[in-house]
Amino acid sequence: MANLDWTKLGFGYRKTNTILTCYYKDGKWGPVESCTDDNISISAFAGTLHYSIECFEGLKAFRGADGKVRLFRPDENAKRLQRSAAYIGIAAPSEELFIEMCIRVVKENIDFLPPYGSNASMYLRPTLIGINPQLGVKSSTECLFMMLCAPVGAYTGGTLQPSYVVISRDYDRAAPNGTGSFKLGSNYAASLYSYNLAHKLGYEAVLYLDPLQHKFIDEFNSSNFFAIRDNSYITPQSDTILPSITNKSLETVARELGMTVERRPVPVEELSTFEEVGECGTAVVITPVYQIDDKPTLESPEVTPYYFGSKEQCGPKSLKLYKMIRGIQDGEIEDPFNWCITL
């Protein structure tokens, strides 16, 4: 095992043993290759560099309480990558190839898989890019699929420390009938200006509204939105939201725990009725939110604040959902949904 302080990894890049690559050319995928160098060589005219012809995924592998290694729902990531690739008109790996490369990259980098109990995991970043040289705006005919990995700590340090968020009314993450529901790098680029501005103002995340009317909640800059009221788990229904696998899993767990699940448009004004609010995604599972500020513009001094629970700790129902997901991932509790692939 690598000589690392597993409890202080943070969420960032760290060199591992190998990355995996697989090229698509002449209508077929080639062999999967291991590379010890995580630099790649592509044409300066590659479509990915000029027209953002790329999509990616994020998932995790965990070393369990029983010593087994588990991948959490890689089949869902494979399907979502295929959906993103189809939208930008490029070839996508089959679900079988996707999962094969997930398993292989974990095995080749097993020394970097954090131990059980460290609140850390191995983050996998499947990445698909268009690589053939081109000048015109068109879908790529040649692609490179890469399976990358890195050991990571919890995105927010593993403390479930509630966050301070602002609503963006003057900037949108996505466009109506646009790419918001696909996992494309360009969507994240679109959120950087408003996120950087909000960060300078002391906020930890940005909550975006529907881009057509700015009346309904969409999602955060890098994660989905959920809320809890009474015994209901509530999350937005919108065509401009990325379909989060974590959110989908939380909905299933909520039902298992006897909660009512509501996926529907969520008006901004409804924030005042929620007991708990959180961000959810692969990197965090759940980050509770203790305050959301609504402003006419990000830099406006006029503020309508909404408060949820404690500034110091996660709400009880969010915590219960979090513990069940993490328990399944770590092999501490039974996986009744057959979500995990055990290596």
Question: Which residue ranges define each predicted feature?
Answer:
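Short, Gly/Pro- and small/polar-rich lid/capping loops
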Residues: 1-36
